[in-house]
Amino acid sequence: MSSVVCPGSFDPVTLGHIDVFERAAAQFDEVVVAILINPVKKGMFDLDERIAMINESTMHLPNLRVEAGEGLVVALVRSRGMTAIVKGLRTGVDFEYELQMAQMNKHIAGVDTFFVATAPRYSFVSSSLVKEVAMLGGDVSELLPESVNRRFREKMSGTS
């Protein structure tokens, strides 16, 4: 059985992330979306909210599950008996950074990384940019799954 981890903070999960999850789910028997917690960063959404948003947005992917983790991605990968990571790439800048990470992960833990080129319609989308544009009054609804957009608007208006 081929299994892979898709790591990230997903704060919030975007349609670009969902695109990568769908494509990974089509290629691998099992996809684990690993929400990695950075104790230094205060996220917009807490861990439970992120898990719920990804679960709601990926119900159509029966071979995908969501987990939380801390520390090195490769430690999580190895602890699950897996050997691979999938990362989405938006631009050449992403590639340069992710290639270094992939080489380090292979060196320290023997973990392979598979890259998925982000669909062109999402090549500019990041969680950070979505938050920034929304905070400045821009409409980001076409960049988020519907259920995520609803929670996002509630959070932005202070009603959640």
From Swiss-Prot:
Co-factor requirement: Mg(2+)
Site for Transition state stabilizer, residues:
H17
Q: Under which pathway is this protein filed?
A: Cofactor biosynthesis; coenzyme A biosynthesis; CoA from (R)-pantothenate: step 4/5
InterPro entries tied to this protein: Cyt_trans-like, PPAT, Rossmann-like_a/b/a_fold
What Pfam families does this protein map onto? CTP_transf_like (PF01467)
Where is it localised?
A: Cytoplasm
| Principal subcellular localization | cytoplasm
- Annotated GO MF terms: ATP binding; pantetheine-phosphate adenylyltransferase activity
Q: Which residues bind substrate?
A: S9, K41, V73, K87
- Look up the record and report any one GO term of the cellular component aspect: cytoplasm
Function, as annotated, reads: Reversibly transfers an adenylyl group from ATP to 4'-phosphopantetheine, yielding dephospho-CoA (dPCoA) and pyrophosphate.
The entry sums up its family as follows: Belongs to the bacterial CoaD family.
State whether it acts alone or in a complex, and with which partners, per the record.
Homohexamer.
Q: What is this protein called?
A: Phosphopantetheine adenylyltransferase
Native organism is: Mycobacterium leprae (strain TN)
